[in-house]
Each structure stands twice: as structure tokens, then as C-alpha cells.
Amino acid sequence: SVYMDRLLIPNFEKLLKISTQKAGTQRDLKTDIRDVQDKFKEVLEYDPQRFFVSNKWFFGLDTKGMPIYFGMKNLLHTQITGASGFGKSVLLALLAFQAILKRETTIIFDPKQGGDEWLPNVCHKATQVANTPYFFIDIRVKTAQINLLEGMSTDQIINLLIVGLMLEDRGDAADYYRAKSRKMARFVGKNYQNGMTLKEISETYDEYFRKNEADGFADALQELAEVVSINASGGILLKDVIDQICVIYVAGDWEDPKHIIIQRMLLARIVQIVSERDNTVDTPKQVCVILDELSFQISKIFGDALKVIRDKGLHFILAHQSVKDLTNVPDNMDAQAFAGSVMANCPLKFTYRAVDNETAQYFSDFSGTVLVDDESRSIEQTLSLTDRILPEKQIRQTERNLIDLNMMLTLPPGTGVLFGNGIAQISKICPIQVKKTAEAKTVKGFEQPSIYENSELSASLVFEKLG
């Protein structure tokens, strides 16, 4: 009898639990990480182009297979986070494709050598659909492609050199030499002749810089002079690219310090061009700047621009792996202030699975709380020393995050959470299917034909015919 009691009671209670009908007013419960993945309903693969519309931005399908749209015509600053391999580049490609179709000048910065495997191909395909010019710039290639200083005013050259070479005072002994370097930056700005390259400036004035105790400035310019790609006597004019609606894919380098400096200076130059646009009467054309692996693009001018540049028609799409990346800043910046600025000025956020607790907890808290039921039960012990659960239960109201920590740590690949578009929504992102082409990564030297030939920039695009 004791044996039967110990055997039957546990199994009978399991049967009761399975067959008991829950109360109609019972709320959701707290999650269990061991079975939370079963709650993610599988969304079949789909073609994102079927869901593109002209006045909204498509952000994937929800758990019911319905499209998620951001309803404003102009996209806000957008932040994308997630571990490597979970789909950041897929979402970047999705948003870049839509920006190109919406006739936005689109500039992609990618610190991976040679560029991403698929993103350039998606952007190239989009330019074919929209019939807009496409340019692939590879900073590492020994081909002159662009003149960084072409078309700049004296003040812009001075500011670009100061920001790019981080010559601001920092309150230490080296400020003495930084002041000397800033003086040489002013000299370069005032003596610049249109068409001069950084290499020509370095070769012409190197001796003068060193005589004026600016050896550090001279050495820095010598390093930049070695980067052939930005020392073209002609080439692509960034101002014309922005004014005429083009697409530029900039493949950089995450290892070589001088290439990282060039990437930051190119971004600073774009910010300068957009900042001087007049919005008194006409609304400036939209410019979309995509920064993949944000930590390689962080600079003081970017941090400041993020706060004010939308008024001039520029919106950023930032991608990085965790919130800790935002504190990996150059010496002339405050890490916490920059991280706070990114979080505050990117109202749209999309995060894939987090692999560190800090990122997972941040976005879980960001999703808000919902009311759930917390159940407690009473147990009695029988004469056979078997625990028996009594039928009476107590339920109390408590809270948990809408997207809790367990969900953030177990999101399937290709699935993320969109914040800033109403209540946080789980979204499935599928890639735009394209074929790899050599043209997507073909570098054009400055001797190439005009960038505006054979482009029908005034043609309207019919979104319904896509896909």
C-alpha cells in the first residue's frame, strides 16, 4: 500500500495538471528559459520586397506573420544590436534597399576589409531597380578614388584636420604640442589650393611643419598621404554625390589605424556637407548614413552630429554588438556621455539575441512591464512520506518585463525585437535574395566617366511592381 501510494500520487498529480482547465481570467506567467524557445512561433521564409511601400518602412513580420511598419515617411536615427552572425547585416541590407528605393542618398561605412559578403550586392541590386549611380570605394586599394579635401572651405579643412587627428586640448602636458599642430592645421586651411591632395600638402609643407615644432602633425599627414585611395587629383566629389542622389559603399579596414582615421574623416566630411545645407524654405533631401560595426566610426564630430543633424535631412542607422561597444571611444571623448547620447537619440532600436547580460538586461527593461500571475501552492505529507499537492491555490499579481531576460538570451537567429514603434514587437527578418556580382565590389578610379551619365533621377519608382 505504501509502495502504491508513493507511485500513484506523483503520476496522478501530473495527470491532474495536464487536464485541469485554467481560469479564464488567468494572466501570463513568468517564463522558464528551458522552454521559452517553444513560445517563438516559426515564421516561414518570405521575400521582403513584397512588403515594401513608398510611405512606410518595413521592419519584418511579427509572430502572426503580419508586416511591421514604421509609419513615418522619414526614418529616425536607428540603432541595431546583436551578436555576430545573428542578422544585423540582413536588417542593414533591408533598410538600405528601402532607402535607395525612396531616392535617398545612401552611404554605407563598413570596416570589414573588402566589404561585407552580401550587403554590397544588395545595395547594387537596389540601385539597378531605382536606376541611381552606385560607387564602391575600397580604402585599402592602391587606386586613387577620391580627394578628401576637394571643394572644402578654409574653415572646413581646419576643422576636419583638428577633428580627424584629435588635436583638441585635453588638459595634459601634450596640449602644448597639440596647439602647435592646430596652428599647422590653420596654416593648411589658409594655404590650400583647390585640387591639392593630402599627399601633396605633406610633401610641400613637411619641412615647414617640423621647423614649427609640429612633428606629430607632420607624421600624421605622412601616414594619411600613404593612403592612395583618398589622394586622387579628381574623382568622386562627396558634395555632388549627396546633392545628386547616389549610393556609396565604403569598405574600410578594422586593423590599420590610418585607415580607421580615414573612415572617420570621410564621415566627418559628410557631416560637414549636410550641415551647411539650407532648410529655410525647402526641406533638404534625405541622406541615409549606415555605420556597420559602429565602434570603428566613433568620433567627436559624429557624437555631436547625432544630436542635431536630423534637421538637415540626415539620419543614421547604427549597428554594433553590445551596449559596451558604445564606451569604446577615442581619448578625446567622454565614454558615458557618448553612450547616453546614442541611446537617447536613436528612438528606433532593433536588437537580436544578446550574448552578454548587460545588453540583455538593458533591452529587457526597455520593453516595459506587464502584469502576470505568480502562483503558490500548499503541500501535505501523507503517511507514506509522499508529498501531496493540495487542491487549493493562491495567485497573486506581480510584474515581469514584456520581453524578459530569458527571451533576450534565446531569440532565434534572424529574429529580433523592435523598440520605439509602439509596444515592443518580436520580428522575423528574412534576407533579400540577390546574386553576387563583381560590379558590386568594383573600384572605379578618378578617370571614370561622369557619375551622372545615364541616370534617371527624376523617374518615380512604382513600389507595387517590386518582387
Model-predicted segments: where are they?
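Conserved ATP-driven motor cores of ASCE-family P-loop NTPases powering translocation/secretion/packaging/pilus
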Residues: 306, 312-315, 320-422
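Transmembrane-cytosolic junction motif
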Residues: 1-26
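P-loop NTPase motor domains
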Residues: 8, 19, 28, 32, ...
